[in-house]
């Protein structure tokens, strides 16, 4: 760890003390410039903290640099930037349209966009020109036809609009028409691949016909030439995929020029552009950027086919329109624990009935501490109640993946999961309590009732955190929040995207 005395000048002291700038950011700065160049060093350290939080670029406007961090004005941040030597600037960054990008990320994004532009102009190897499916709505049929008859599509829609169902119908129709077609479905999480595998098995589609893998496993096997190219590559949970991974996926596609016409594989990306973007250095919001860059490739599903109460629908609609939502002031911890305990006691024994969601990992309102407190509170009076759990390690022999949820029966010491037989708890220890869950981990899951906790310290998030949390609920949603923090989140614009100018 870097020494505060030797590597932190008075310019950075406060932000280091507040843990806004961390040792990793100081190490990044020190790697590229001497700490004796105080202003330039400060710029690199602060910008590193912003890249680390997912901002894809910094904006220059009227000798101010946005966004900055607490305690460093935009004018001062710009002054630090001006002190950066040209050799450092040219080696690390790209400046375009008054925006500062990390060169490595900018290069990957531009390569991806170039390849997707070519793919957009190509002809599909396998098309279905006349098929209309009775199982699909008119809206879904329109998206179906456009997706199967092009080489690049973005199928976008909120929870319940039928993205996954539509993808399954596309697969069934293509296999029926072209039995030898090669199809792969990839997702950023094992939980999502497990869900798709379960749905396809209901339609008697085996992995002999369709390859289903996490993105990392798919790319790993492709790199070692353990799999051939595919005629259709379907990317599920596209809102969680970084530019870098998308670029690697596109590189697995093949194409050929036949008499001046490009014939290529088909890429379909499924996602909800309003959900949380991926976590990663300079990640931004790739799905929103793709929609902005390729609007003609974006196919939107608007109608929800999933039964959700008016309360849940009204909450999510209000959030997207940046309107105030009903909430309960965040109670003292003991009061909150008492209410949560009562809610779990009155909930049927199912891992999909109730969940507490929080954006925080650490601290009194982080899910690690909440799980510990809720567990001990319930054990005092109701030790026989089933304990909700979450898998923390992949175990393919049992069909379990990181993020899968279930429950532990205290009496029998058996673990139960919706798509798996029960497992002796003594034989499998890779799980944790799941009374409370991070909003990020909840993506792809649904619960009847959800309690969302928004404490102080969540001001760095935007409305995507609220939208994602609220849309996990099917029946009832309760928001417990610090009033000022909730207001700041609702009124705060989305984190920057590459395609749209937004200043915080």
At which residue positions do the language-model features occur?
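Conserved ATP-binding/catalytic motifs of P-loop helicase motor domains
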Residues: 1-504
């Amino acid at each position: 760890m870097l020494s505060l005395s030797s590597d932190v000048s008075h310019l950075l002291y406060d932000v280091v003390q507040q843990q806004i700038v961390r040792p990793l950011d100081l190490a990044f700065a020190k790697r590229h410039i001497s700490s004796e160049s105080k202003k330039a060093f400060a710029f690199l350290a602060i910008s590193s903290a912003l890249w680390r939080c997912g901002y894809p670029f910094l904006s220059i406007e009227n000798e101010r640099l946005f966004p900055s961090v607490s305690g460093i004005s935009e004018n001062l941040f710009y002054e630090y930037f001006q002190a950066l030597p040209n050799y450092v600037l040219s080696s690390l960054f790209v400046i375009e349209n008054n925006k500062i990008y990390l060169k490595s990320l900018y290069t990957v994004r531009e390569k991806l966009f170039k390849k997707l532009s070519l793919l957009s102009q190509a002809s599909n190897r396998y098309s279905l020109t006349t098929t209309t499916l009775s199982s699909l709505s008119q809206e879904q049929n329109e998206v179906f036809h456009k997706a199967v008859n092009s080489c690049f599509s973005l199928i976008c829609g909120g929870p319940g609009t039928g993205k996954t169902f539509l993808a399954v119908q596309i697969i069934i129709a293509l296999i029926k028409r072209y039995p030898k077609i090669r199809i792969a479905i990839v997702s950023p999480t094992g939980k999502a691949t497990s869900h798709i595998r379960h749905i396809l098995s209901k339609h008697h589609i085996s992995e002999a016909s369709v390859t289903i893998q996490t993105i990392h496993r798919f790319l790993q096997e492709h790199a070692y030439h353990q799999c051939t190219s595919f005629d259709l590559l379907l990317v599920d949970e596209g809102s969680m995929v970084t530019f870098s991974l998308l670029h690697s996926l596109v590189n697995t596609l093949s194409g050929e020029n036949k008499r001046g016409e490009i014939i290529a594989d088909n890429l379909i990306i499924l996602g909800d552009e309003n959900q949380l973007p991926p976590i990663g250095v300079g990640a931004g919001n790739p799905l929103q950027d793709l929609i902005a860059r390729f609007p003609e490739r974006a196919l939107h599903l608007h109608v929800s086919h999933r039964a959700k109460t008016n309360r849940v629908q009204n909450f999510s609609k209000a959030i997207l329109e940046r309107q105030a939502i009903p909430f309960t002031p965040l109670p003292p911890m003991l009061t909150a624990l008492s209410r949560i305990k009562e809610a779990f006691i009155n909930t049927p024994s199912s891992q999909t009935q109730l969940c507490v969601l929080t954006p925080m990992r650490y601290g009194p309102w982080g899910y690690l501490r909440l799980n510990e407190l809720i567990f001990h509170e319930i054990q005092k009076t109701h030790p026989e109640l089933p304990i909700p759990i979450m898998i923390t390690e992949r175990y393919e022999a049992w069909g379990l993946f990181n993020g899968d949820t279930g429950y532990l029966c205290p009496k029998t010491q058996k673990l139960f999961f919706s798509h798996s037989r029960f497992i002796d708890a003594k034989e499998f220890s890779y799980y944790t309590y799941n009374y409370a869950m991070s909003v990020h981990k909840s993506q792809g899951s649904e619960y009847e009732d959800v309690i969302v906790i928004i404490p102080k310290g969540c001001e760095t998030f935007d409305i995507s955190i609220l939208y994602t949390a609220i849309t996990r609920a099917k029946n009832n949603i309760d928001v417990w929040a610090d009033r000022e923090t909730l207001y700041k989140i609702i009124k705060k614009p989305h984190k920057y995207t590459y395609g749209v100018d937004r200043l915080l």
